[in-house]
Curated annotation (Swiss-Prot):
Annotated positions of the Histidine amide modification: H25
Keywords linked to the UniProt accession: Amidation, Antibiotic, Antimicrobial, Cytolysis, Hemolysis, Secreted
Name of the protein in question: Chrysophsin-1
Secreted found in the keyword field: yes
Subcellular location: Secreted
Amino acid sequence: FFGWLIKGAIHAGKAIHGLIHRRRH
């Protein structure tokens, strides 16, 4: 469960980072 939580957090972080990068670009 903990590993899944971290994996989910990383995925969410990448998604948010991608959205921010797209908005800036």
